[in-house]
Amino acid sequence: MRGKHIFIITALISILMLAACGQKNSSATVATATDSTITKSDFEKQLKDRYGKDMLYEMIAQDVITKKYKVSDDDVDKEVQKAKSQYGDQFKNVLKNNGLKDEADFKNQIKFKLSMNKAIKQSVTEKDVKDHYKPEIKASHILVSDENEAKEIKKKLDTGASFEELAKQESQDLLSKEKGGDLGYFHSGAMTPEFETAAYKLKIGQISDPVQSPNGYHIIKLTGKKDLKPYDEVKNSIRKNLEEERTADPIFGKKLLQSELKKANIKINDSELEDTFTIVSPQGN
């Protein structure tokens, strides 16, 4: 969540709580200027109109997730202590700069984050683990943004050009190009689905046709394959890898949150906020 966004939400919650406790004071003055007066009711309406749906989304999302995927106070406190140790005397300033009112507000954000991480980890099923029970493979690639360019490179490779030299000359992957496109060994699930599907179909030494992924167009060469270990020996490491990859993927987290909210039977009683969950997207965690 962005700090400014959290600050607005926190401020709005406080104001609306005060409003609920004192409706008779809705005409009270919040601020004045020459020929201008801002009443409490006008101020509250503007806040609700501008930020009410964001606030409602955040409140319900946090409530749904933290109640379904419970984490201990000890785990929350450990994360808070880590932050305090990291920032030392600057801890309060860091909270302020990120729009957090106080340590209790920070704890709420940590609790939500830990609960989301727990939800993501529990999303990994036995079927997911078995689907990724594949040997580690080693591959090199040449990455370009244009399909026609990828086809031209493939033609050169088909006529005997060096894969490693073309990778150094043409690849747009700065991390691997100086190594001739070498990506090293990787396990199932480590690469984009498009890349992985193509790579696992290759025989050692074989070069693929151009493969499109969100990163561009890849030409892939399979250069190694490890022996597949017994399932019982590797299933825990496969699960851990999947958990870590999903936790690090913000898109997966957003989709999971949306799925959980759909299952939560949410009913909005305020007509001005009733479309909150059709037009507001999660801000991340």
Swiss-Prot record:
Residues carrying lipid (N-palmitoyl cysteine):
C21
For this protein, the record's PROSITE patterns field holds: PPIC_PPIASE_1, PPIC_PPIASE_2, PROKAR_LIPOPROTEIN
Residue span of the signal peptide, if any? Answer: 1-20
Q: What reaction(s) does this enzyme catalyze?
A: [protein]-peptidylproline (omega=180) = [protein]-peptidylproline (omega=0)
Q: How does it sit in the membrane?
A: Lipid-anchor
Report disulfide bridges, numbered on this chain: none
The record's keywords, sorted A to Z, are: Cell membrane, Isomerase, Lipoprotein, Membrane, Palmitate, Rotamase, Signal
The listed locations are: Cell membrane
Major site of localization recorded for this protein: membrane
* One of the record's GO cellular component terms: plasma membrane
| Gene3D superfamilies in alphabetical order | 3.10.50.40
Top-level taxon: Bacteria
Name one process (GO BP) from the record: protein folding
Q: What class of enzyme is it?
A: isomerase
Residue stretches making up the PpiC domain: 134-224
Named from the GO MF annotations, one term is: peptidyl-prolyl cis-trans isomerase activity
Q: Which family does it belong to?
A: Belongs to the PrsA family.
Q: Which HAMAP family match?
A: Foldase_PrsA (MF_01145)
Q: What does this protein do?
A: Plays a major role in protein secretion by helping the post-translocational extracellular folding of several secreted proteins. Important for the secretion of the protective antigen. The three PsrA proteins in this organism show different but overlapping substrate specificities.
Q: Which PANTHER family match?
A: FOLDASE PROTEIN PRSA, PEPTIDYLPROLYL ISOMERASE
The protein here is known as: Foldase protein PrsA 2
Species annotation: Bacillus anthracis
Q: Which gene encodes it?
A: prsA2
